[in-house]
Amino acid sequence: MALDEKFQLEVIHLLLQFLNDYGYDESLKALEKETGLVSETEDVKRLKQAVLQGDWITAEAAFSIMQLRDESKRKEAQFLLQKQRCLELARSGAICEAIYVLQNFESTDFNKEKERLVSIILESNNKSNNELITKNGYGNTRLDLLNQLSEYISPEILLPKRRLEHLLQQAKDYQVSSQVYHNVLKNFSFLSDYKADPSELPTKEYHVFHDHSDEVWQISYSHNGRYLASASKDKTAIIFDVVNLKRVFRLIGHIDTVAYIRWSPDDRYLLSCSCDKSVILWDAFTGEKLRDYKHGFSVSCCCWLPDGLSFITGSPDCHITHWSLNGEILYKWEDVNIYDMALTSDGTKLYIVGFEQLINAEDKHIAIYSVETRECIKKISLQSKVTSICLSKDSKYALTNLEPHTTFLWDLEENRIVRQYMGHKLGNFLIGSCFGGKDDTFVLSGSEDDKIRIWHRESGKLLATLSGHVKCVNYVAYNPVDPYQFASAGDDNTVRIWSNKDNPRRQ
């Protein structure tokens, strides 16, 4: 494909910057000589040298003649120069001179920022200057300033930092995202197109655990990916070793269905929620029952706080309860019949889904609570009943299963649905879905038609429909360490491990 003249010139500029950045001086000189182009104009060199040497008068003069991307932003960029000059004066102890520089910057658009800076500078006069200034977000170096200024200057004059690498990363990201089977990046090269095939999906039934005598309602992987815990209608929970494919402990202590189970952040403990109105704390290393937490009604779900010192439970009696490990109730909210809950990775926000039958209507919503203030931040009303919620690793997205046959992907920063996944059957049971793959590139869900479905998260394309269970698949969970393994739990009393490879023991 022939490049037009403008495109050729832009490519040459990119190459010149690349050679300059990586110290290929002879190659740079040769390309400049052959093309008649330069990696940097004399004006740009003067600006860079002045900033790096702290020659602020020369820097201001050099910047004043620069062509900008947006001329209306010139004062904003000039303020960056003055701010750096001011902060360096303050760090050196020249407090009065630093404040004078700020007060003599002619624009009034930055008065609030100037007032804040003056306050910090005056306070720093009585403390460690550098520490206080850096602590308040003003620790940029001169090189940082140059990079900031480059964002204002026209790219025809000064290319943004490492522009070629940035473009190559964009090309790489695009190629990877366009491959619906992409899971783990292998052997990527810019010399050929990236391809990912279906072997990246864990679609093979690797092992079946038959240890339960009744329906398995929920499963949970340990954070180290070595163990899987299951919750069953047979009133027990089981810890499985998914490496050696064996049962480790059967946890006996509940007198009714075990509905939900979760590992502590350090994998030292397990919490099991039951229809017998209790939550039990277990020692995951020994299988020993450590403590009972009594409720007034059955308990449907729970989640741990990141420090592992407390946890939250949800119940059909519309109560959300924050517990300490020693059994103290720290706080209690009242909402709706709680089906499921999820906590952001930083432990600041609690998402709950539930349903309540009112006199003349039904209340179906997602509620978001601040763990710190304990206030309800937002309630999102829904048309259908939500049976489960699962957060992405970065806590920016959530999956919810809605009756009768849709899994929705939510953008949690904007609180809106961005994608939907269809084909499965939801309705009579509480079916769980989850993210999967190394970078959460897949979406998985159980179904009342005994199948498991895997979709490409970004496109919504159905990638695989898996058979194996002979009754409703209640829950799926993805191994947090092994990107090629997930587990499923069903009403056929089994827990199944899925992989992208065959189990040699079953052949």
Swiss-Prot record:
Its main location: cytoplasm. Identified in the GID/CTLH complex. In the absence of stress, the complex exists as an inactive anticipatory complex (GID(Ant)), composed of Gid1, the E3 ubiquitin-ligase Gid2, Gid5, Gid8, and the RING-like subunit Gid9, awaiting a substrate receptor to form the active E3 ligase complex. When cells are shifted to glucose-containing medium, the substrate receptor Gid4 is induced and becomes part of the complex, named GID(SR4). Additionally, Gid7 transforms the GID(SR4) E3 ligase core into a higher-order supramolecular assembly (Chelator-GID(SR4)). Residues 40-97 form the CTLH domain. WD repeats lie at residues 211-250, 253-292, 294-334, 342-380, 381-420, 425-467, 468-507. Belongs to the GID7 family. GO terms for biological process: negative regulation of gluconeogenesis; proteasome-mediated ubiquitin-dependent protein catabolic process. The gene is gid7. This is GID complex subunit 7. It is found in: Cytoplasm; Nucleus. One of its GO terms (cellular component) is GID complex. Keywords: Cytoplasm, Nucleus, Repeat, WD repeat. Gene3D superfamilies: YVTN repeat-like/Quinoprotein amine dehydrogenase (2.130.10.10). Component of the GID E3 ligase complex recruiting N termini and catalyzing ubiquitination of proteins targeted for degradation. GID E3 is regulated through assembly with interchangeable N-degron-binding substrate receptors induced by distinct environmental perturbations. Required for the adaptation to the presence of glucose in the growth medium; mediates in association with the substrate receptor VID24/GID4 the degradation of enzymes involved in gluconeogenesis when cells are shifted to glucose-containing medium. Transmembrane segments: none annotated. InterPro entries: CTLH_C, G-protein_beta_WD-40_rep, LisH, WD40/YVTN_repeat-like_dom_sf, WD40_repeat_dom_sf, WD40_rpt, WD_repeat-ST_regulator. It comes from Schizosaccharomyces pombe (strain 972 / ATCC 24843) (Fission yeast). Coiled coil: none annotated.
